[in-house]
Amino acid sequence: YNKITVNGTNLASTDPNNRSTDISMISQYMLEGIEVTKAGTPDQDGDVLGGTINFILKKAKPGFHGNIITQGIYNGLEKEAGDYKYVGSVGNRFFNDKLGLLAQIDLENRTRSSHDLGARYNNAPANLDSVNALSFSNMVLTDINRNNDRTNSLFVLDYQIPRGNISYSGLNSKIKKNQTNYSDVFALVVEDRLYNTGEGINDINVISETWKYEQKLLNNLSVDAFTSFSMSKNDS
């Protein structure tokens, strides 16, 4: 499996049954860059068989900066215009650009609905030396109504020291997934028709905090120390 980290801190799994991580919890507007390591290196923990994806969070830039992004989205499948995305951020550096502060919030509501088609065929008895006609046994038409409501917040504090940096980053991401399924089942073999309805709600919360100290002592010698906290909660 692969490992997901934020500023070098392992992001806790968001799935209760495996080690997978839902990377949609991280807004693209919070990122300065992405580091991809295909195989483990000597400076990394040996707790992953695959590669590592490290999301690098933004830091405040010199001068006062503010940014607002608004998006309105029309969904043609559901014929709705209620989807939106709002991003607001503010940042500045103080004391001759030594101290930096950055805060950002990201609000998003998206319709992820879809239509699914499932079918089953029979060709019994299936022999390798013969060609049998296929018979259509059943078909399932499903209308899947999905809605994702996400809230992300980010706070980054950093201070420049001689040949180094001390920083704190706090990421809090919440997403609520509502899904309702309406299925129309055509059981052709028994000449029957069934209707099924199902509903599911999934609330995911991810928190990641990191204190980091970096300093270059000599041209070929540097020190890097950090303490971190990572948590995920999945209610369904």
Where are these regions (language model features)?
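Extracytoplasmic beta-strand/coil segments of soluble accessory domains associated
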Residues: 1-10
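Short acidic/polar hinge/loop motifs at secondary-structure boundaries
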Residues: 9-38, 88
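Flexible, solvent-exposed coil segments and beta strand-coil junctions
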Residues: 15, 31, 62-71, 126-138, ...
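Outer-membrane beta-barrel domain signature
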Residues: 42-44, 75-78, 140-144, 192, ...
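Transmembrane beta-barrel wall of Gram-negative outer-membrane proteins
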Residues: 79-181, 204-219
